[in-house]
Structure formats: C-alpha cells, structure tokens
C-alpha cells in the first residue's frame, strides 16, 4: 500500500509540493490538519464541548483530544476535512454548518518527530446524543461531553482531573 501523500507548504502557507506524512514529520515540513470542535449547551444552558479519547494505536494513544481532527491528503482543502468527523465519530456533517474560527500554526518537536502544521479550526454546534455516535475503534476509544469552563480550568491547571 502506498504511503499517504500530503501537501507541503512554506511558513506563509504557499504550496510547495507533496511529501509523505512520515517525511513531513521527520523533516518538519509544514502541512495541514483539519480541526473541529463540536459544541452544545447543557439542559441548564452551560456551554459544553465533545472531547475524544484517542485510539490505542494512534499517536498520543489514550489521551484526550479535540472533537475531531485529521491530516488533509494532497489536493484536499479544509472543506474535505469533514470526512474526518464521519470516519472518527460516524457523524455526517454538512460543511455549511461549520463556523470557521481561525487557522492555528502548531509547532511541536519530540525526539525525531517534528510537527509543523497549519490547523484550519472550525466549530460545529451539534446535539446528537452520545449513544448515536458510531466511533471508529481504530481511531477513537471513546467520547465524552465536558463543560467548557471545566476544560478551561484544566488547561489553566486550576484542576487536575
């Protein structure tokens, strides 16, 4: 099976060509990864977010992650990123329902893994009950809903669980 090719960019997001994901992470080449935060309101009106627990065979296994994310293959745009939501969570989404928030520049390095990503980041308001999600066990071990305030407090180290 041929390795997946992804588009490679310069630091200003000008397209340069393609490379494999492995090469991009080995050499620190800029590429794109679609991000989507799925949000809703609790019955009491509190803002909430859907978070996933990454699959055991994924990078950063069994850790909490955003609602849905994934690399964009060569030639794909953020519009094509909705495929990740269906592949991971079994949720079919109309791209028109997404709200573009921003494009983040993500830089991370650990040992021989160098990640330089542009992350077009979207918001989706969706109240699908958790039992209706069809999780792909290759990518996702579980999902849960958390109050946004609790997640922010965790990020700010105000709570540890």
Regions found by a protein language model. Give the residues of each.
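Short hydrophobic "helix-edge" motifs at membrane interfaces and signal-peptide entry regions
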Residues: 1, 57, 137-138
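Acidic, metal-coordinating catalytic segment for phosphate/diphosphate chemistry
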Residues: 1-44
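Short loop segments at secondary-structure junctions
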Residues: 12, 40-44, 55, 125-129, ...
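Conserved Nudix-box catalytic region and its N-terminal flanking loop in Nudix hydrolases
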Residues: 23-35, 44-88
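Unchanged
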Residues: 70-161
């Amino acid at each position: 099976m041929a390795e997946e090719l992804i588009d490679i960019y310069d630091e200003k997001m000008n397209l340069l060509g393609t490379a494999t994901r492995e090469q991009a992470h080995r050499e620190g080449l800029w590429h794109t990864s679609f991000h989507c935060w799925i949000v809703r309101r609790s019955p009491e009106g509190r803002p909430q977010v859907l978070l996933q627990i990454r699959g055991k065979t994924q990078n950063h296994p069994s850790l909490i992650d955003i609602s849905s994310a994934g690399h964009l293959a060569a030639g794909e745009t953020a519009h094509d990123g909705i495929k990740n939501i269906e592949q991971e969570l079994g949720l079919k989404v109309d791209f028109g329902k997404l709200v573009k928030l921003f494009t983040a520049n993500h830089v991370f390095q650990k040992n021989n893994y160098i990640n330089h990503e542009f992350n077009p980041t979207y918001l989706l308001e969706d109240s699908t009950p958790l039992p209706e999600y069809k999780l792909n066990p290759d990518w996702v071990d579980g999902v849960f809903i958390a109050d946004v305030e609790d997640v922010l407090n965790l990020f700010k180290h105000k709570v540890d669980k």
